[in-house]
Amino acid sequence: MLEAGAIEPRRVKLPGILVDGIVEHREQPQTYLGGYDLTISGQHRRLSSNDAIELVSHPVRRLIARRAARELVAGASTNFGFGIPGGIPGVALREGVPYQSLWLSVEQGVHNGMMLDDALFGCARNADAIIPSLDQFEFYSGGGIDIT
């Protein structure tokens, strides 16, 4: 526990009136799939290959992702919404789209990296930035995306 006033007021994220107690749960899983991956939390980077992102298994989703991958533009700030768009990064990696020249983001606040899909949608390995989703929507509403 910290003494009252031990944190600079601008760094406080949750006012004390809303806190009854603090519990540390050391076994809390990071994702639905359990365990803890330092490359998802941004604490570690590791080399990854073009098969680092799994392809969507459903053929119709893969077809849609392939078509959408053709619309990606190098240097454009691109938002991937939830659902079908989650399959686009995996297809783009394998189909010769210059993945490293793209600026990718999702509403959860992740920028770039190896975007994950399915139960891990909203996560990325080796992200360049992970910001609060409220800040992400400010970025979007302020004109920060070129393609969505």
Name every feature range the model reports, one short phrase each.
Residues 1-49, 113-148:
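Conserved phosphate- and dinucleotide-binding cores of soluble alpha/beta proteins
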Residues 50-132:
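N-terminal active-site beta-alpha-beta segment that forms phosphate/nucleotide-binding
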